[in-house]
Regions:
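Hydrophobic packing and interface segments
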Residues: 1, 6-590
């Protein structure tokens, strides 16, 4: 059965890319819509009790989490079923079909990644431009409270919270979620390429999808477990969120063992423990981020103490603290990579295919509870905007006190969510790097090359060549100057990208500062409350600034791998990906 006919997979690639980007954008849109409605309801609920405010804000954030995982798994399932029907089975090599399906589906992940890139960069520029403009002129120069309706940039600031921390974070984790499942499925198919055991190959492909599906249900259970008492402190509030997250994590561990046992997957016990490793790494990164960013712990308290001697010492201490804070997450990810590889390979480091599958399944484990993990992050801007609504609508001091407590919690959960997103992206990136080799296999097959002539004189069939064979064929070693050049370029790219986006924020924020000053100067009666500021103008400045400034950094991230591949070939691209992944990971945590 060849439903695709002579047109091949070309149209499928285009449609997968578009659907990946579309569903990523749709999840961000729905999350923003929910967050916009929820902030007013959270402020209203905070009039009754802190617990009601927390539950409304958190469950509204859960909408974002569940939309992301639901749409992601829906689209993955749709394309798998469609491609399984459309692609014919090769009678001579039946295991090749699953490799073609899983590598083809990576195009869907590329669409999601592209959308995440634009959402993250554009959303970040929008958010920070509005934030800097509102705080620098309103709070510092004019001396009015935060979220005061007299500040022209207040609405832009509140909108920016949703754009950057809801839509941007949602698109980011949507990409990591889908990427981890797709890369692990591709590595599972590759682990059994050329073997007669196509049933075991199918089990390896379907396992990450089943774990993710069960994770959605267990995330919902954890969401309903979140509650707190009145007058709770920061540690109690953090504990209430941790209760839901930990409950989901424990349940997914049990469920993973049952799923892989029922599947009868080869080495299922060790692979189940690899999932546990992924979950533990995620928890460690979250707790580490919480420790370094929460006001309840020593690092932030010492940073606040340094403010007694002036802003210079705060900046110096903050940079130093940020650098130190990278230690635990990096050690956690490194340990997770080694342990998951070692477990899935059956304690045999030479079994590269299954070892890489273990790293991928660890990333799936880390993201299996994304439904509730993303809820804790999307909760942040909802609580923040609820405080703004309480301030602008003149609700009582008790309400503002409750929303401030929720907002303070939201700042910590936002930092935790970012750390979690970065850690999961590191494992997913490594799995995608390995699956890049599978794309090379498919590419060589389509070009008509059937044999690999290795440097040691051995010839290997392209379909049955191992990961090591491809590394030998392309001379991917540290002694190859192409690999080293790619690694240096990748390391540099992370810093160049950050520098460009920071400069973009600076330029957009400067326009915002000028506009707020202009309105204070030209519209008489704003500071006395007799005249209304032009909020729309500030929103327009942030929007145009974000759209204009995000183009060059985003295009740079897309074009760099293509240019490197054309100049240095496959070794250069692999070096670029390794360098970008390692330096980008540390820089992102910092």
């Amino acid at each position: 059965r060849d439903v695709l006919g002579s047109r091949g997979l070309g149209d499928v690639y285009k449609r997968q890319f578009l659907t990946g980007g579309f569903f990523s954008g749709l999840s961000g849109f729905l999350g923003m819509k929910t967050a916009t409605y929820a902030s007013a309801r959270t402020a209203n609920a905070a009039q009754h009790s802190l617990n009601k405010g927390l539950r409304v804000a958190f469950r509204s954030g859960a909408v974002m989490g569940l939309v992301v995982v639901g749409l992601g798994l829906l689209d993955i399932s749709f394309w798998y079923i469609l491609l399984d029907y459309c692609i014919p089975t090769d009678a001579l090599n039946p295991s090749a079909k699953l490799c073609v399906i899983t590598t083809t589906m990576l195009t869907f992940g590329m669409g999601a990644s592209t959308q995440a890139l634009f959402a993250r960069v554009g959303g970040g520029i929008y958010t920070k431009a509005a934030d800097v403009g509102a705080d620098l002129v309103g709070k510092v120069e004019a001396g009015i409270p935060e979220d005061d309706p007299r500040n022209p940039a207040t609405i832009a600031d509140n909108v920016g919270d949703n754009v950057g921390d809801v839509a941007g974070m949602g698109a980011d984790l949507y990409e990591s979620y889908c990427g981890s499942i797709l890369a692990t499925a591709a590595l599972g198919a590759a682990a059994f390429i050329g073997s007669d055991d196509t049933v075991m190959q199918f089990k390896a492909v379907i396992a990450p999808m089943l774990i993710a599906a069960v994770g959605i249900v267990l995330s919902i259970i954890g969401i309903f477990a979140v509650r707190t008492k009145e007058n709770a402190g920061m540690k109690e509030l953090l504990g209430s969120l941790a209760t839901g997250t930990n409950l989901s994590s424990v349940l997914i561990v049990v469920a993973t063992f049952l799923i892989l046992w029922a599947l009868g997957l080869e080495n299922w016990v060790n692979i189940s423990f690899a999932v546990v490793v992924g979950l533990i790494v995620g928890i460690v990164i979250g707790r580490s981020t919480e420790y370094y960013t929460s006001q309840s712990y020593k690092p932030t308290q010492r940073l606040a103490e340094s403010g007694k001697t002036g802003p210079a010492t705060v900046i110096i201490s903050g940079i130093g603290l940020g650098m130190v804070s990278t230690t635990i997450p990096v050690l956690a990810v490194v340990t997770g990579i080694i342990l998951s590889y070692w477990l899935a390979s059956g304690f045999d480091f030479a079994n590269i295919s299954m070892g890489l599958y273990g790293i991928g399944i660890a990333a799936v484990g880390m993201l299996s509870t994304l439904g509730i993990t993303l809820a804790t992050d999307a909760y942040g801007p909802i609580a923040d905007n609820a405080g703004g609504n309480a301030e602008m609508s003149g609700l009582g001091k008790e309400v503002r006190k409750r929303t401030d407590a929720l907002d303070s919690l939201g700042n910590t959960t936002a930092a935790t969510g970012k750390g979690f997103a970065i850690g999961s992206a590191a494992l997913t990136g490594l799995a995608l790097l390995a699956s890049y080799v599978e794309e090379i296999r498919i590419g060589l097959t389509r070009l008509g090359q059937t044999i690999l002539e290795l440097p040691n004189g051995i010839t290997v069939d392209v379909h049955n060549a191992s990961f090591t064979d491809y590394m030998l064929y392309y001379d991917v070693t540290l002694m190859n100057p192409k690999v080293l050049s790619g690694m240096f370029l990748g390391s540099m790219m992370a810093f160049l990208f950050c520098g460009l986006t920071m400069n973009a924020v600076g330029r957009a924020a400067a326009h915002m500062v000028e506009e707020v000053r202009r309105q204070f100067r030209e519209i008489k009666g704003i500071l006395t409350g007799e005249a209304e500021p032009d909020y729309a103008r500030c929103v327009q400045i942030s929007t145009k600034g974000a759209q204009r400034e995000m183009v060059f950094p985003s295009l740079l991230a897309i074009i760099a791998p293509i240019a490197t591949g054309l100049i240095f070939g496959v070794p250069g691209v692999i070096g670029l990906l390794i360098g970008g992944l390692s330096s980008g990971f540390v820089l992102a945590i910092f």
